[in-house]
Each structure stands twice: as C-alpha cells, then as structure tokens.
Amino acid sequence: MKIRASIRKICEKCRLICRRRRIIVICSNPRHKQRQG
C-alpha cells in the first residue's frame, strides 16, 4: 500500500474508490494499491 498526496490509476484495471472519507485505488496487481494520506 503506497500512501501518496495525489493518487492516480496506473493501469486499466485500477479502480478509484472512496472509503471512510479516503480515496483508495484497488487493482488486481497488488503493487498498484494506493491510499491518499
């Protein structure tokens, strides 16, 4: 899980989701997991 100020989709399978007032990226590739912090 990478924590970044600005997150973006890395590939086509990445999905942006809002959870508990946080924006996270979920992907089939575990390296693409991100969270805004």
Curated annotation (Swiss-Prot):
Where it sits in the cell: the answer is: Plastid
Q: Name one GO biological process term.
A: translation
SUPFAM superfamilies listed in its UniProt record: Ribosomal protein L36
- Recall the GO molecular function terms of this protein's record: structural constituent of ribosome
Q: Which InterPro entries match?
A: Ribosomal_bL36, Ribosomal_bL36_sp
Similarity-based family: Belongs to the bacterial ribosomal protein bL36 family.
Its recorded name reads Large ribosomal subunit protein bL36c
Instruction: Give the organism the record lists.
Output: Epifagus virginiana
